[in-house]
């Protein structure tokens, strides 16, 4: 009986197996997943997770030599694509921005800790569009001139502080960056790095950075965990407490400006612009206060980071410092400080700003984008939900674009044969680098940052020489040119000492005179 049944059933099973295999084969052959970009093979379950440890920008650069400008990684089931050329990054993130302007989901850092109000993390949608439009109108190239007086005053204080306490040059850079951004956002300059507002916002940045790190919370891998009641989930309770605390902080700063606007005694600031245009942008006070706070948190860290790298470059490449000082002597002279009125006449200083942003990036892999729909690029399939990372480190140091000396600090690469600023590479939007990002997510504060860097660099080089420090025997102190440390949202050079002296006899007196005219004694 068993043998008869087996003989009757076997052909059916064979036919079924043939159909299933044929169907599966056809599905596989037709599946776009067969055409993923090339990339390293991963391990079972975790995929390429181990490749993403350490300095990712160096790993991506090395792997790019084998796999090309478009690389695919499987990160524990999450598709990730790395963009290793300016053209590929611009093709996708700029020219197909409609598909690639989202951010990866981050339940703790974005949804809970910041209530979806942190514009750099906010998912692509209506809230982001309204916040982005408001920020753009307050910080676009046509209006940032109103911040010139603040930036000039802060550059004077920076220069005076460094000349008075050269051993604390980095502290003065960080104070100035915080003060300038705080003044431009809230018209409330802090008194020092220890100012409660600065300390509280720096604490916010540190907590946010920890929460946003990959693998920081299991809920990012198991989204159902977000529905666990707060009393049973310490991570959720702490994130909610952070949101309450930080909302109160940002709203307090914002309401201070609101009170001054009501009295009619406010000065130009981003917060006052947001308040005056609140109805037009349809943003709540909470959304506006978080938008202003985000601009401070992002701007202060990045500007001070760039200035630290620039200081290192002045020591390692002294010939660029001398050329910049020669330009300052020719245009400004030695009887007054540089100002924004000199901007058009100082092309080498402006080129130095571009080079400082290109040579060492404060964020070597930028902020990730996410695709919102399936796409095909150059024959390769990029599925919806893919995280895309532009390897800014390599994009800014590509020898095919910047020449064989791309790894070196050389502002002259941004000048033409007549010594004027040359047009930037095709996909850099006239910045001559891609440090500010791409597409609809490009840094909205880049014009403010460029201006701050210009006046800080011009004034410091006008007044001082920056050289390599030595020990008591005149032996140069160690200097790690290639190393870096990760500090919150940015990377900074390994701490180093610098020898800073007045460039000519009257320099310090002129700076002090300007400082007193600002009301500081």
Curated annotation (Swiss-Prot):
It is a single-pass membrane protein. Its EC number is 1.-.-.-. Keywords: Glycoprotein, Heme, Iron, Membrane, Metal-binding, Monooxygenase, Oxidoreductase, Transmembrane, Transmembrane helix. It comes from the Eukaryota. The keyword Metal-binding applies. Glycans are attached at residue 450. Melleolide sesquiterpene aryl esters are cytotoxic secondary products with anti-cancer potential. Armillaridin shows therapeutic and radiosensitizing effects on human esophageal cancer cells. Armillaridin induces autophagy-associated cell death in human chronic myelogenous leukemia as well as of hepatocellular carcinoma cells. Armillaridin can also inhibit the differentiation and activation of human macrophages and thus might have potential to be developed as a biological response modifier for inflammatory diseases. Its cofactor is heme. CDD domains: CYP64-like (cd11065). One of its GO terms (molecular function) is iron ion binding. It is an enzyme of class 1 (oxidoreductase). It is found in: Membrane. One of its GO terms (cellular component) is membrane. Belongs to the cytochrome P450 family. Armillaria species are both devastating forest pathogens and some of the largest and oldest terrestrial organisms on Earth. They forage for hosts and achieve immense colony sizes via rhizomorphs, root-like multicellular structures of clonal dispersal. One genetic Armillaria gallica individual localized in Michigan's Upper Peninsula stands out as exceptionally large, covering hundreds of tree root systems over approximately 75 hectares of the forest floor. Based on observed growth rates of the fungus, the minimum age of this large individual can be estimated as 2500 years. This is Cytochrome P450 monooxygenase ARMGADRAFT_1018420. It comes from Armillaria gallica (Bulbous honey fungus).
